[in-house]
Amino acid sequence: MKRVLTALAAALPFAAHAADAISGAVERQPTNWQAIIMFLIFVVFTLGITYWASKRVRSRSDYYTAGGNITGFQNGLAIAGDYMSAASFLGISALVFTSGYDGLIYSLGFLVGWPIILFLIAERLRNLGRYTFADVASYRLKQGPIRILSACGSLVVVALYLIAQMVGAGKLIELLFGLNYHIAVVLVGVLMMMYVLFGGMLATTWVQIIKAVLLLFGASFMAFMVMKHVGFSFNNLFTEAMAVHPKGTAIMSPGGLVQDPISALSLGLGLMFGTAGLPHILMRFFTVSDAREARKSVFYATGFMGYFYILTFIIGFGAIMLVGANPAYKDAAGALIGGNNMAAVHLANAVGGNLFLGFISAVAFATILAVVAGLTLAGASAVSHDLYANVFRKGATEREELKVSKITVLVLGVIAIILGILFENQNIAFMVGLAFAIAASCNFPIILLSMYWSKLTTRGAMLGGWLGLLTAVVLMILGPTIWVQILGHEKAIFPYEYPALFSISVAFLGIWFFSATDNSAEGNREREQFRAQFIRSQTGFGVQQGRAH
């Protein structure tokens, strides 16, 4: 049992490594012209899609949700494209390359939040909401306060995630293409703004679908070539890997990377519940016509992602055999050229030559663009729909709301570029963990309880939600990553690296206590309205479908 618990604990802290995959030491590579040419082909193609989409974006619904006309299969691919990052592709395969079996457990950690979304979130979210998850949270509660809280939670998560992605983009492109870091960051920012500004959700969706297809194809080809090398025998794969790896048979044992079980559990909870609170993921469920398609979206997305993470495991072991044992991929000191995070890239060269290496490098860049486009649209919708149209200027026309959304896209893009450049040499690994912690501590409790707990009131949601958000931020600042490593203090005030275990508890307890003790007339009215909301969430009665959505 102890061994099982250790393995489960090891499955949880993936996000720190995923962030490190794009924020660690980077050795700039020679200019890769094949990769640049393939990437330019991708850019031209996706800009063509953006132009096509811009001709079909005629309303607010078209811009935010692609008119609600995306199918479950298409949306599943887009969700997978939005969630599968370059960090997971390079980082998890690098982890398998260095640590073996632990990499498989880590990769499974990516999936633990999706059953929650499938069984608890997707159907009710689609039946109750229109454009953002704040539509659901405020369905029977006070619009103003709840939308402000939801928008703040969304914007903080988007900002943290976006900074981490932009810094990672610059480092990764410097690593893969040999381009200057600043040029890479500006290029990602400009393309991101163009996709979202002109094409809205329709262009963003197709960029994510294309990226997912390319990534799945590339990873499948690499895994196929690795298995072909060992006669399609997993026994041969593991035997050959153990024979050449410095750790020998130890790479087949789990638990070698666990240092602090509390931090591991905390990060795992942040990942599990944070996935169900990520605004750019939740927004995707409004692009389909009904709850049935929303469920199908999660089903397909989970299948695609599960398949992808199995491939990264094979790729990692293939890299042990074909890259780790090949001196052509080592520098004078015997280390992997470009660092361990180049393991999958070197394997692409080993199994497919320079042309396939260029393809995989271009796919890694496309992966970043797909993720940041989704983040930007989620942030823009929080400002324009939740804050502008429903709080500060109620009754604003669709045209005014879309204008504000597009201005927000430009502002977010410029801020992302500036912060990406400013944070070039900073430790941004903590930002991914903090983004998940805030999503889990603020967004997720409010979404879940607003849909399932009849006694929830505005007072409880506001106080509990703000407590969860602030607790996550304060504990992260006082923890070892920021307080010691960044601010330079000798000892951390909060001893654990990730705060989600504590901040989620504070959020749920706060929401329960302040709702249970709310005896106001407004609170009683909100409780009475739960039955009507419940019927709507179960039946979808009154939900608009398709282009009318």
From Swiss-Prot:
The chain crosses the membrane at residues 33-53, 77-97, 103-123, 148-168, 183-203, 206-226, 262-282, 303-323, 355-375, 404-424, 428-448, 464-484, 493-513. Keywords: Cell inner membrane, Cell membrane, Ion transport, Membrane, Sodium, Sodium transport, Symport, Transmembrane, Transmembrane helix, Transport. This is Cation/acetate symporter ActP. One of its GO terms (cellular component) is plasma membrane. Its main location: membrane. Belongs to the sodium:solute symporter (SSF) (TC 2.A.21) family. It is a multi-pass membrane protein. One of its GO terms (molecular function) is glycolate transmembrane transporter activity. Gene3D superfamilies: Sodium/glucose cotransporter (1.20.1730.10). Transports acetate. PROSITE patterns: NA_SOLUT_SYMP_1, NA_SOLUT_SYMP_2, NA_SOLUT_SYMP_3. CDD domains: SLC5sbd_u4 (cd11480). GO terms for biological process: plasma membrane acetate transport; sodium ion transport. It is found in: Cell inner membrane. The keyword Methyltransferase does not apply. It comes from the Bacteria. The keyword Ion transport applies.
